[in-house]
């Protein structure tokens, strides 16, 4: 039975959503002390891509993804 490397076990699949014509890609990356950094990429066909790294840190990767997605929706609402 193959064993996963520790860095592979911490990787999560990015969450892709759309909001008001923007594409939001929330992702998480392993950080210090077992935390997960909430990262976000925001794309729109008529605007430059916005990349936000380590918006905040969470003990759970799912929480990081949820936070990054919610943060992105607020960002889009503020720019629209």
What are these regions (language model features)?
Residues 2-39, 43-45:
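N-terminal segment of the canonical double-stranded RNA-binding domain
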Residues 42-44, 55, 67-70:
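Short, charged/polar low-complexity linear motifs in solvent-exposed/disordered segments
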Residues 34, 53, 76-77:
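A generic "cationic amphipathic patch" detector
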Residues 70-80:
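Short arginine-rich
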Residues 34-36, 59-67:
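Short, surface-exposed linear segments at secondary-structure transitions and domain or protein termini
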Residues 49-63:
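A short, exposed loop/beta-hairpin motif centered on an aromatic-Gly-Thr core
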């Amino acid at each position: 039975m193959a064993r996963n490397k520790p860095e592979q076990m911490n990787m999560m699949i990015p969450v892709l959503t759309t909001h008001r014509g923007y594409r939001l890609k929330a992702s998480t990356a392993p950080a210090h002390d077992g935390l997960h950094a909430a990262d976000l990429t925001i794309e729109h066909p008529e605007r430059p891509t916005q990349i936000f790294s380590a918006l905040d840190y969470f003990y759970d990767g799912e929480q990081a993804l949820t936070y990054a997605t919610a943060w992105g929706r607020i960002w889009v609402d503020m720019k629209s």
